[in-house]
UniProtKB/Swiss-Prot annotation:
GO biological process entries: DNA replication; mitochondrial DNA replication; mitochondrial genome maintenance; positive regulation of mitochondrial DNA replication
Domain of life of the organism encoding this protein: Eukaryota
Protein name (Swiss-Prot/TrEMBL): Single-stranded DNA-binding protein RIM1, mitochondrial
Compartments in which it is found: Mitochondrion
InterPro entries linked: NA-bd_OB-fold, Primosome_PriB/ssb, ssDNA-bd
Species this chain originates from: Saccharomyces cerevisiae (strain ATCC 204508 / S288c)
SUPFAM superfamilies: Nucleic acid-binding proteins
Amino acid sequence: MFLRTQARFFHATTKKMDFSKMSIVGRIGSEFTEHTSANNNRYLKYSIASQPRRDGQTNWYNITVFNEPQINFLTEYVRKGALVYVEADAANYVFERDDGSKGTTLSLVQKDINLLKNGKKLEDAEGQENAASSE
């Protein structure tokens, strides 16, 4: 009578998966622009302004969104000026300029977004401008 035990195998190493991610907390600094890719897929582009220090320089990041539910959420509910937390995959690409020199660009593809505080409605912003100009 031998009892059979179950064996589980663990590997100390896993398949190597390198990746680059970026987390940004900032304000949406541009209107959303919709595009259609060559294979007829919809995508969205916008920019985020982030100022890490109160007295520091503002950093601008261009974001691309391919996820359809996120595109719908952004275009329906989020306004310019909104404070957002964005997680994006990051990749550098080298390109050649017209003069033959090489340049590098940072590509950020949004994977997740959290709306922290929405921007002002257009009517609210216009109302404040009118109130300020009539004083």
